[in-house]
Amino acid sequence: MAYLVWGKGRSGLAAFNLLKAKGFKAYIGDDKEDKNLWQDVWNEIDTVVLSPGIPPFHPLWKEAIKSSKEVIGETELAYRFYKGKNIIAVTGTDGKSTTVHLIHHFTSFKEGGNFGTPFSEIVLDNDKENVALEASSFQGKTLDTFRPNVGVFLNFSKDHLDWHPSLEDYLLSKQKIFKNQTQEDILILNAQKPVCDTPSLAKKIFFGENGDLKVVGSDVYYKDELLIENISHPSLKGLHNLYNIAVASFVAFSMGISLEEIKKNLETFEALPFRYQYLGNFEGIDICNDSKSTTVNALMSALESTKAPILLIAGGIDKGGDFSSIEAYKDKIKAVFLYGKDKNLIKDQIEHFLKVYVLEDLESALLKVKEQARKGDTILFSPACASFDMFESYKHRGEVFNELVKKHFNS
């Protein structure tokens, strides 16, 4: 049995190292340095292990299907060597990392997957480790035997259509994460369609306003009985984050962690940066950095959670979202400041109901916002777009925004 790992990022290297440690013949390459390698070793290999960034239309993927070679991802590979009993898998368009980080904090399970440590790296270190994995649609598409005993599907909205051939494929790739669950397993689902229709034999628990698990004020109820009182957290503002806490708490409770311990652990939780991160009050103006917002759905959650009047900074590379949907929040938004590659495309969708300024870059946008801001306003940086037109990643974008705030505002 021989493998070809394609992609030399952290997950690709982790997969390659795991295979070598297990004594398998394996090659590793990528499009930048080893473009022809896969053709040179094609007749020797049985299985192709693709990194999450390799899309279905990549020539290697197409050739593998044509040649009837097995195509899997790093998560599936790691699972085949995993000997532990507890895998929690969390997916959704938004909120995955925060929820996994909460579960890790409540349970001490090793966190990883799409964010942080690759599953293969965890398995190589300890193949019996209890794990909480963030699972993306890219990883879901290349799963086969993977089976989490606890699954979570937080939400679903249009995203990644530059990678998936259709919205249906994006949804099916996420649902595939749970296809091997049995009646012994648990699947926690958003009560809204299409998430609630996810096929699985697992015991299903729905969350949301009309679900089994719901947030009322800041309290969590399960089947109309109080489960946990006051789950509010200063770094996790908004209803969407209360549900992230509620779901993570329920997962931890289902794994045997007491409600008292969950509450105690919540008090010491430190939120991940750039996810609706409150930077502070500057000369009477609140500033929030939500650079992780790469979809309109994430922007909507941020707008829902932010006190008016809002000065919104957004823009970057549009991912096919419907920006006209923010009309529902037009009474909260004082003005919108757009920058980035698709600023004019976004402007065309919202200028008939909002005051819009179009700027050259993020710093220009922030300076224009500073001109317009008054005491009591909230500056919300929630781009709702990919970052790669001007930044290396959403993290880099978030770091730049924080530096610009330090440069132009006095605390």
Curated annotation (Swiss-Prot):
Q: One GO molecular function term?
A: UDP-N-acetylmuramoylalanine-D-glutamate ligase activity
Q: What is the lineage of its organism?
A: Bacteria, Pseudomonadati, Aquificota, Aquificia, Aquificales
Instruction: Tell me the function of this protein.
Output: Cell wall formation. Catalyzes the addition of glutamate to the nucleotide precursor UDP-N-acetylmuramoyl-L-alanine (UMA).
The pathway to which it is assigned is: Cell wall biogenesis; peptidoglycan biosynthesis
Catalytic activity line of the entry: UDP-N-acetyl-alpha-D-muramoyl-L-alanine + D-glutamate + ATP = UDP-N-acetyl-alpha-D-muramoyl-L-alanyl-D-glutamate + ADP + phosphate + H(+)
UniProt xrefs under Pfam families: Mur_ligase_C, Mur_ligase_M
Family, per entry: Belongs to the MurCDEF family.
This protein's name? UDP-N-acetylmuramoylalanine--D-glutamate ligase
Query: How would you classify this enzyme at the top EC level?
Result: ligase
The compartments listed are: Cytoplasm
SUPFAM superfamilies documented for this protein: MurCD N-terminal domain, MurD-like peptide ligases, catalytic domain, MurD-like peptide ligases, peptide-binding domain
What organism does this protein naturally occur in? Hydrogenobaculum sp. (strain Y04AAS1)
The highest taxon in the source lineage is Bacteria
Residues binding ATP are: 92-98
Q: Which UniProt keywords apply?
A: ATP-binding, Cell cycle, Cell division, Cell shape, Cell wall biogenesis/degradation, Cytoplasm, Ligase, Nucleotide-binding, Peptidoglycan synthesis
GO BP term (any one): peptidoglycan biosynthetic process
